Amino acid sequence: MKRLWLTGYRSYELGVFGDSGEKLKVIKYSLKKQLNNYLDDGLEWLITGGQMGIEQWGIQVAQELKIDYPELKVAMMLPFSDFGQQWNEQNQGTLMTLKAQVDFCEPVIKAPYSGPQQLRQYQQFMLTHTDGALLYYDREAPGKPEYDAKAIETYQEQHEYPNNQVDFFELQDLANELAELENQAF
């Protein structure tokens, strides 16, 4: 798999507010493990959006991984041209910083937001420009990623498209693994 679509929960859906905390540490640990596996299998492009949460954290982790995998490229594909403009100043600043760090950043639709059809067009773009997905989503905890999960399932009916879903059970296992590793360090 050369091109991976990364998406999932927004930060508020996971109860993560700010740039630190145990939940965020576990999520970034998970992202690093997942992306390392993809990189070892030949991943060239991580393609994601700019949403606060899994997408932005994935970009941050990918930037760190570039030290060991300088061939990794990161693309931030935004659904529409005025994406993030309704956010507060701090969140807009984070988005601007990440936009400057990635290898490629463009809106899929070069017009301001006008309706939900743009989000469906964005999903279709992401599906047709990637070889598979890494989706942080748990069917037991509905949220925004549910729309992406449904779009992926519909696309899979006609196309070979691997979808690796990370659910809360897997995150809990990784939290336990990380705690064990941290305890061994002392």
Swiss-Prot record:
* TM helices/strands, residue ranges: none
- Name the Pfam families on file: YpsA
Which top-rank group of organisms is this from? Bacteria
Q: Tell me the InterPro entries matching this sequence.
A: YspA
* Signal sequence, start to end: none
User: Which protein family is it in?
Assistant: Belongs to the UPF0398 family.
Spell out the PANTHER family in the cross-references: UPF0398 PROTEIN SPR0331, UPF0398 PROTEIN YPSA
Q: What protein am I looking at?
A: UPF0398 protein LCA_0919
To which species is this protein native? Latilactobacillus sakei subsp. sakei (strain 23K)
